[in-house]
């Protein structure tokens, strides 16, 4: 078994799901367990300045082996998994030499992953894939990134003959709930530039991401006995449905791709008396992003005129912005990644992230930080999988980037 696979299978055994609407960082105590294990592993590998912060951030240094003036590079991945589906008791399975057909994830439950539903699955024919048993997500997002960074670190620490500058490693909590760098110590991290290893398909390089906002839409209804409700009842749940119908139908995650933004209704809580709808708003274009937020407010105003003031109230909070403007002055980061992939006969593909990464916010905190692939697909659900062959290649990509910066 390859080292990166062995590490990955170990890391996904840790239940590290983060939670929304929790004040502390980390949002769940279970993230500490993996953090402590990673801290101990880094120490055992011989990394220096290994430390864990009071907010569950793990940092480490691989000292430079060259006297040349070389930028200090950082590599960052996150420890938590998305709350979209449970990651407790993950039972990974390695499908050897995938034949290109359907993969039965759980025969008893009739859960099958098919290239008819997931066409990109076919691209992995002949590779070894790590899949779920259909009852949990896998955790490749971002434990594949952690395994790749850790395996890269082990290689550099056991091959001191390789010339490289100072390498900084950072593992973060709570990325999936938008708080991954709330307490990240950029100055103490000590990197001039960094990469997150939190992408998807092998060969992808990302330095554009969504502008993102979260919305908490509160609706105050009027509860009356339904037998005597004529002209009196305001059903908050139905009002929420009316609000949703006033948003553009085509600007929905299921109908968008590439640079197209969307409104996404993530969760509904409510009764006749009151309801709360939780939305996320996304767009790569800053102007369109602002327009989407304005439309949200306009719909609230319109419905308040119809149903009475203070029936609808929206709390809109920006989460992160498109890092493109912060990375473009340092395009050597993208160019080096391309060069590294080409040297390894991997075709680089620059694509926009239809999401966000810790790197997006780090870029606005003074640490330009594009995103690199991990080899995983179908994140945040039971059909998630990771290519073992791709993980091994990503380790090589990281090492090659480091070597290129030392030349």
Swiss-Prot record:
Enzyme class: hydrolase
Cofactor: Zn(2+)
Residues annotated as binding Zn(2+) 2: 141, 176, 380
Single GO cellular component term: cytosol
Catalytic activity: Release of the N-terminal residue from a tripeptide
Pfam families given in the database record: M20_dimer (PF07687), Peptidase_M20 (PF01546)
EC numbers on record: 3.4.11.4
Binding site for Zn(2+) 1: 78, 141, 198
SUPFAM superfamilies: Bacterial exopeptidase dimerisation domain, Zn-dependent exopeptidases
Signal peptide: none
GO molecular function: metallopeptidase activity; tripeptide aminopeptidase activity; zinc ion binding
Family: Belongs to the peptidase M20B family.
Protein name per UniProt: Peptidase T
Source organism of the structure: Lachnoclostridium phytofermentans (strain ATCC 700394 / DSM 18823 / ISDg) (Clostridium phytofermentans)
Lineage: Bacteria, Bacillati, Bacillota, Clostridia, Lachnospirales
């Amino acid at each position: 078994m390859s080292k990166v696979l062995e590490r990955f299978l170990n890391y996904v055994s840790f239940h590290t799901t983060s939670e929304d609407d929790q004040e502390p960082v980390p949002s769940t105590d279970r993230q500490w367990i993996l953090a402590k294990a990673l801290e101990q592993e880094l120490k055992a590998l011989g990394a220096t300045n290994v430390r864990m912060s009071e907010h569950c951030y793990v940092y480490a240094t691989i000292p430079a082996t060259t006297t040349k003036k070389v930028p200090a590079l950082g590599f960052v991945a996150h420890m938590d998994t998305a709350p979209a589906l449970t990651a407790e008791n993950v039972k990974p399975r390695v499908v050897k030499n995938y034949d290109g057909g359907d993969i039965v994830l759980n025969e008893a439950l009739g859960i099958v992953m098919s290239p008819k539903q997931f066409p990109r699955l076919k691209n992995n024919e002949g590779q070894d894939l790590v899949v779920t048993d259909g009852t949990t997500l896998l955790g490749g997002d971002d434990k594949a990134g952690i395994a790749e960074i850790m395996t890269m670190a082990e290689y550099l620490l056991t091959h001191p003959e390789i010339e490289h500058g100072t390498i900084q490693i950072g593992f973060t909590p709570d990325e999936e709930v938008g708080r991954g760098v709330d307490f990240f110590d950029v100055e103490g991290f000590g990197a001039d530039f960094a990469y997150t290893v939190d992408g998807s398909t092998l060969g992808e390089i990302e330095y554009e991401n969504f502008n993102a906002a979260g919305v908490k839409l509160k609706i105050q209804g009027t509860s009356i006995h339904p037998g005597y409700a004529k002209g009196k009842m305001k059903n908050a749940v139905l009002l929420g449905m009316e609000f949703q119908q006033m948003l553009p139908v085509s600007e929905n995650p299921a109908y968008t791709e590439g640079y197209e933004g969307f409104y996404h209704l993530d969760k509904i809580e409510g009764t006749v008396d009151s309801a709360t709808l939780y939305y996320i708003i996304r767009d790569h274009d800053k102007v369109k992003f602002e327009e989407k937020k304005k439309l949200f407010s306009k719909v609230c105003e319109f419905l308040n005129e119809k149903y009475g003031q203070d029936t609808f109230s929206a709390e809109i909070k920006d989460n992160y912005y498109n890092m493109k403007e912060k990375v473009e002055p340092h395009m050597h980061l993208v160019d080096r990644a391309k060069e590294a992939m080409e040297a390894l006969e991997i075709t680089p593909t620059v694509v926009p992230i239809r999401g966000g990464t810790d790197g997006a916010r780090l870029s606005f905190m003074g640490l330009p930080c594009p995103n690199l692939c991990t080899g995983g697909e179908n994140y945040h659900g039971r059909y998630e999988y990771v290519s073992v062959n791709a993980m091994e290649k990503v380790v090589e990509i990281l090492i090659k980037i480091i070597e290129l910066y030392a030349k």
